Amino acid sequence: MARDSALNVSVGIIAAVMICVAASQASDVFAPFALALFIIALVWPLQSWLQARMPALLALAITMTVTVAVCIAFASLVAWAFGRVGVSLLADTARYQALYQRAIDWLEDRGISVAGLWSEHFNVGWLVHWAGQITGRVNTTLSFWLIALLYVILGLMEVDDLRRRAQAYLRPETARILLQGSAATAVKIRKYMEVRTLMSVATGVLVGLFAWVAGLHFALEWGVIAFALNYIPFIGPFVATLFPTLVAMTQFESWEAAVGVFVCLNIIQFVVGSYIEPRVSGAMLAMSPTVVLLAVFLWTYLWGLFGAFIGVPIVIAIVTFCAHHPSSRWIADLLGGPVEKNDLARA
């Protein structure tokens, strides 16, 4: 019995590693497909409501129009904010270099020699260039989104057919796990995005108000950036506090002011992310912070910036499906808690 358990664990680990390798090597195929499944989970209630009242193709056209319009509006807003901030950062490269040199001189006057070490591994010009690249870079190309939207169109057309096929051709227990797991996963993903959007709006408003009260340039842009990056756990909030700090360094020409801006922004992120959000999301989306952090970094490594965004929904899906089978329920209990009865009823 113990040998069988050890064998099952070993096979599971090997399978997980192989899946990660396949996801990385075939990211051009799997990443758009993952995005499509995510979008389908979000928009299916709209599609289902519309196609009950009009022809399915007309309902699909309306759903896709709304989806594309929301994506374009969000991308345009983010590009506007990052573009304005990025131009400012690149224009102040010389001032950042001067502040950096002043910091080195201050440390050396106190017997702390770091110039030789930092000059080999760190340069403010490189840092600003890197920051400027981030502000102007979109990790997902047009072809990526076109493929994903094609998957969405085909997927929305086949949801009902796939449900009937699963019930007709799969074993009853397998069909139950697949259908209930898919429905519960979709419910949780919609809840996740609802909570994440509310918290992103709250974070953006608070950051924008703080920047305006503090007299920091680009207050509206900082609010938009904080709103957008809050969709990426851990990494996004850190970047959203780093950029305003860089601008504060040149605007106020004071390390103390820059540190103050950095601390205040992190307090906002901490209060919203660690205190308010868990109470809004409740037990339905409860997951270990370690699991969330691992998911973010793992999928960032596999799929880049898009992986940082989609990592948590992937873990939500894995935990939810594991909760619907007795042999894997312990994984759900370990990573995210047992499935809630009201979640299944709502699905």
Regions found by a protein language model. Give the residues of each.
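Anchoring transmembrane alpha helix of integral membrane proteins
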Residues: M1-W80, V259, I316, T320-A347
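Juxtamembrane membrane-interface segments in integral membrane proteins
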Residues: R3, L46-M54, L58-V66, A73-I147, ...
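Alpha-helical transmembrane segments and their immediate interhelical loop/hinge regions
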Residues: A6-N8, R137, T141-Q251, W255-V263
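Generic alpha-helical transmembrane segments of integral inner-membrane proteins
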Residues: I13-M18, A22, A61-F74, L142-L149, ...
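Membrane-water interface of transmembrane alpha-helices in multipass transporters/channels
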Residues: S27-L35, V213-V224, F252-G260, M287-V292, ...
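Hydrophobic transmembrane alpha-helices
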Residues: A36-V43, V152-G155, V224-Y231, I235-F238, ...
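Membrane-interface starts of transmembrane alpha-helices
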Residues: M54-T63, A175-L178, G236-V239, S288, ...
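Hydrophobic alpha-helical transmembrane segments of membrane transport and translocation systems
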Residues: A258-A347
